[in-house]
């Protein structure tokens, strides 16, 4: 029991013990707290009081105090010096990526250009279409942009023909239009007897003789150029070309071995030579042959159109089916002439390939073209326009400008006048001469007397009153009271054999009056003669609206006009009978079905039976058809009668403003002056004479060619002519479009066989922007003549020490230049790649055509040889300059002609003053002597006129219009003044050789983003040069603001700073209390009449202000930003190059001051060493006042002795640290970047890491100017991206060649370097130092100037610079200046004013002397071009000096 109690009491005891322990622990903790409180409140204050009550003494002497003070001051200086005064070096950490430079040869520069070039070189070529339809669609583009109905009409009767390798096809273009849809066709032309075998043997020697290379070529595949580019010959043909000429014998001329050489073919006894190769997707027929397919109707009745289509149209392939029989018959023929005439002129056979040796030809038959002519006559005129456009742009341009066969074009007009010499009745001519003779002596002194008949002033009398009664061909006095016959009895044609345009039964009076005057008859007779000459002399040449097809002409583009139709004008023939005759008459021989809508015929037949002749009258009244007399009336209205005095030039050579001249009396002489000798001293040669009844200016009007000749009157006699202006002539042809076909047909009949051959073989290549014309390494089988557009020459080279290829831009080809003759004549591969900068067109001359023409006309070979020789000489000159140059520059800048033909002005965002900018730029271009035109959407629509909304013609008209403007004007400015979605915006971008991208410099949002116009620019992938034009309100650039624009714009290659006022919209302030002024403004806004008056007054004031600004633009200041931009864009830029020379470079400030005083503009600035400093100051502000002050401030800081002493360091790398020098430059330039400079600027430095000369055009200005001024030993090199940069003067102390690469035409080069000591030395083979020291102090020594070690090191360092200076002096266009500053040392910065006055006095005196002697360069916009040679005075320009 007790045990249980004891166990129960155990927890109680345990709880008591734990309670006691807790109590003790709490007491202990309270004791610790008390201890802490006692120490903090009692002990520590007691100890502090005890310590403070003691006395502490420190004994220091004065030296110790000074030392401690100096140490403290040194520490503070070190902290301030390296912590707070090195802010200019923070750009390495902050903007290291921003400071991109063209330095560092290891790193690629000019990123956008290299990237774009490489992209288009590496781009895979577009795949060719693989089916017949795609090939056909490619070839049908030669007709232009056809309507859907016309396209279906041409294609629904199309057939195909397959040809194997052992078959030969006679190319008879009368059967239809032929297109190669599969394979490659070889076209051969007949070799005449004049071209003997010896000549062809000589041709074969130009081939390749390397057997190994030919064997390698045999294994390669055929290369093709995309997008109608250079159709290269395959490798087998190139091998045969070289190997087929062994032992002086052409295999192609051997009957047994003709297949071994594709260049020649023997068919029976007739030899053929390869003319061209036509690949799939190209037309086999000539485009001009289409004119023969629109065959005029030969039936006697104009209401039977199906008669002309009755004969079946079949493919004439006699040389395929009956080749053996024909060849056998020809072999037995002994007459060579008969044999030559029997063989076809052109034959076609497939080209042998590895996979297939057959071709498939699609044939559009002649009947299809006849149906198109009948149903859609307007579309027929579109095709004729395309034919004439190609004839002018490709054939005639190439013949005249490149081949030099201008005589063939002259023969055309001579044959025209010989074939039709149509005179006028003598009584009409005598009456006109008598009226002209009564004009009076005062009027006769004028150049020409115009007799243009006003539409209202038709006649002065209702009866004919003849002024001439002499020898009238019409006897009797009744002539004075009856209408005059306009037919000369001598020139009348038998109407039964050939129906003329004027039918006697249907003659309608010319005027609105009942009777005609003598002048009216004269005009009608002249027009009739002109029509007969140009081919409009038969009724079948005009369109006839036929009854069966009239209902089909529902399209707006196919409204045919009825001329001379008996249904309208012949009352003798019932219309109903004619219709029934037409409907029921079909041809049984039609091999190609002619479809007609039966429902339309049935309804028309019922309609005609019910209405009868009444319908004809209603149709006549409603449609008011055009008659032949209306046409003659229209031409007669625009015709002028002129009397031209003797020895008067009517049309100047190369003039566009010409017309058609019909000689009434007297004669006109045609003179020609060759292009090579076209100058004021050259004399023109008389070509032929146009007598009475002939016409002059035919080619200019019909084809659209500019006048190739000068038209003059004889020295002793004048001429009476009828004149139709070219513009009036073209407008009338557009109105009466059906006249184009007969006129074009007449033109084709006049072309010689040689011209037809050239037209057939020439290729019209269209290369879209960014596509490759020919690639590097391709076989050269033809050369190109640039018709329009621009091509960039790119070469791909392997970079040293890297597997990557480096793309180098070599130059650009523009309008009128030729490409690829050297490779063709040397039978080599393409050495470069050609990329289309914009949509371009070329005329490709195949190698085979060139060889044929060269044997027929040796003058062509001579001319092309001269052209090739000049190109080779220019390339050798460039190569020699590169070989003799001792400088390896890391700059990738190669000279590309900036003479841009087309300039596009494109805004970044909407709302920018594009129109004002364009007006000022165009005015500046005109001020520098450029023939320029500004083209906007309104002007383009005005030119297109009624064709503006015709999709089938608008592109052809636009391309022809743009090509015409490029030929007529030196520069065409495209103004993009439309929204982004507009077609005109895309047209402007695609047409520009150079795109000027306008941007508001203060627009921070657009600077960091991409504008909507820029997005379109990127989307179109244009390769044209793009320059950013930053528009500033004031002539000031915020530091670092330009790089913000350029950082993310890889597509921008350059930039310009332009000062121009921009109107900004006032920002609206928040709502507030309405004032009296606001209420009045609100009332004013509601009054529309006041608003209209205000806008009218405002527009007048703004226009007046704009005119005043444009007038004062060039004369007001030689520092005009628009003049500077115009000179840069026109290769007329003025460059200023300032050389290095230490303190002697202060004279640069004086030279710049003299330039300002004489009003000489500066567009580009470059410099070395101290020249980079002064040039940078001038480029930054373009103000001489600020330059003088800042240069003097820098000189004072550098010449401070104490600053240099404190900057001294232990001379391991240099004597001074460079801190004071760096800070002195930074104090002047601050954080300004080179991109912020107002004028384009560059400086050079010597990269001792890569052993190159680096060119700096971007980055912080102070850093690279300091690098260019880093004299070795005195200053440490500037470290930039791992490379050490020193003074640029070690390699080129006067970088003139670098300025030349940037397109500067006139360069003022100022040299202030030390004179190179070239005293001869002869001190033997050994040299004692003691002897050198003795000779320096010996006044009688012959060798006092023996160099020491430092002199030798300096001379060694400047070896390259000395040679570069001598090369710069010999460079054309460089004006070398050297002020007399040899007496000043390199570090004489303390003599600032003295050196400045030396440079100012020298330059001012020199420029004044040049002005007096007329030796100053003819700077564009500064010197009147026409006044310089005639003693014209220089334009005086003044300026207000401001900071």
Curated annotation (Swiss-Prot):
It catalyses: a 1-acyl-sn-glycero-3-phosphocholine + H2O = sn-glycerol 3-phosphocholine + a fatty acid + H(+). GO terms for biological process: glycerolipid metabolic process; lipid catabolic process. A nucleoside 3',5'-cyclic phosphate 2 binds at residues 746-871. A motif (DGA/G) lies at residues 1287-1289. Pfam families: cNMP_binding (PF00027), NTE_Ploop (PF24179), Patatin (PF01734). One of its GO terms (cellular component) is endoplasmic reticulum membrane. It is found in: Endoplasmic reticulum membrane. Its main location: endoplasmic reticulum. It is a single-pass type I membrane protein. The active site is at residues 1169, 1287. Residues 81-1443 are cytoplasmic. Residues 1136-1300 form the PNPLA domain. One of its GO terms (molecular function) is lysophospholipase activity. It comes from the Eukaryota. The chain crosses the membrane at residues 60-80. Residues 103-122, 199-251 are annotated as: Disordered. Keywords: Endoplasmic reticulum, Hydrolase, Lipid degradation, Lipid metabolism, Membrane, Repeat, Transmembrane, Transmembrane helix. A nucleoside 3',5'-cyclic phosphate 1 binds at residues 619-750. A motif (GXSXG) lies at residues 1167-1171. PROSITE patterns: CNMP_BINDING_3, PNPLA. Residues 210-235 have a biased composition (Acidic residues). Inhibited by organophosphorus esters. Residues 103-118 have a biased composition (Polar residues). Intracellular phospholipase B that catalyzes the double deacylation of phosphatidylcholine (PC) to glycerophosphocholine (GroPCho). Plays an important role in membrane lipid homeostasis. Responsible for the rapid PC turnover in response to inositol, elevated temperatures, or when choline is present in the growth medium. Belongs to the NTE family. This is Lysophospholipase NTE1. The gene is NTE1.
